[in-house]
Design a protein with these regions (language model features):
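Long, contiguous binding/interaction regions
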Residues: 2-41, 52-65, 70-72, 76-127
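Short, well-ordered beta-strand elements within core beta-sheets of diverse protein domains
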Residues: 43-46
Length: 127
C-alpha cells in the first residue's frame, strides 16, 4: 500500500432508491378538477434517489392526468421501502384501502410509477 492509498476516496456508491413523497399544489390543465374546485394539494410518492428526481416524476404524472403543477412544496418525505406500511398506519390510518399495501408498493412504483395520496381540494376565494 502506497503512502497516499489510505487517502484515496472510496468509489461513490449510487444512492439507494427509497420512496420519496413530494407535496404538489395543482390546478386544472387540459382536464378540469371536479367542480367547484379551483385546485388541490396532493402528495406524490415515487422511487427516487433524491427529491429533485421525485419531483420530476411526480410532475410528469400530474401532467399526464391533465392537471398543471402550480407549486412544488420544497420539503420532501423519505420513506424506506420496507417501512411503507408503518408510514401508512401512522400517517394515513383513515385511508387503508386508498394506498398499495407493503407487498404491492414496489411493483406500483417500478418503472417510474407514482402513487398519490388523496387529493385535498380547495375552492376559489370568495370576493
Amino acid at each position: 500500500m502506497g503512502l497516499f492509498d489510505k487517502f484515496r476516496r472510496a468509489k461513490r456508491q449510487p444512492l439507494a432508491l427509497q420512496i420519496v413523497g413530494i407535496q404538489l399544489k395543482i390546478r386544472p390543465g387540459t382536464k378540469p378538477l371536479p367542480g367547484p374546485l379551483a385546485g388541490a394539494y396532493v402528495i406524490a410518492f415515487s422511487l427516487a434517489g433524491d427529491p429533485k428526481e421525485a419531483a420530476k416524476k411526480s410532475a410528469l404524472a400530474i401532467f399526464r392526468m391533465g392537471y398543471d403543477v402550480e407549486e412544488v412544496i420544497p420539503q420532501a418525505l423519505h420513506i424506506e421501502l420496507d417501512r411503507w406500511d408503518k408510514y401508512l398506519s401512522s400517517t394515513w390510518p383513515e385511508f387503508p384501502d386508498h394506498f398499495p399495501s407493503q407487498a404491492e408498493i414496489a411493483e406500483a412504483l417500478s418503472n417510474g410509477g407514482v402513487v398519490f395520496s388523496p387529493f385535498a381540494g380547495f375552492e376559489p376565494p370568495v370576493h
